[in-house]
Amino acid sequence: MFPRAHAAAYVMMAYRIAWFKVHQPMAFYSAYFGIRAPAFDANLMCKGDGLVMEKTRQLQGQEKRTAVEEDMLTTLEVAHEFYRRGYRFTPVDIYKSAVDQFLILDNQTLAPSLTSLPGLGEAAARNIVEEREKGKFMSTEDMLLRCPKVTKGVVETLTAAGALNDIPKTNQIDLFEMLSGS
């Protein structure tokens, strides 16, 4: 028999989760995506509900799914709900995103964690956060010098996600660009 105390604990936990989902939705989604959604892929989920639904349909159309795909499907369903409620994600940003937490930027916006990018591990993310606190990166070259745990593959991942758009590739100044008035 299932003890009543366990049943009561499960009911209390379900009630608390439901309360947060209704009354503090951004806190709920921040915690859910940061803790309960290991399959969160910022490259996919931060690009809008249309892409989320397309991937959901693709996974639902498969007869057999792996455990990773099942986790992805659950995460996609919660992301779809997130978008339907009028919320949005910002792109991953090396200056704003935390290592492994989703940050609440305002009542409508979550900033995904650095580790939500596939291929960007916790050690590299921590290294980036530690170094950004010491000062801005002058270039991706500077990032590679200052962050020994960041590889060229991580830089490619960040570049593909648009997280390095405002940072030049090298520390060298282009004389022609400087003279043309940029």
Task: Give a label for each model feature.
Residues 1-182:
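Noncatalytic, beta-rich nucleic-acid-contacting surfaces in large DNA/RNA-processing enzymes
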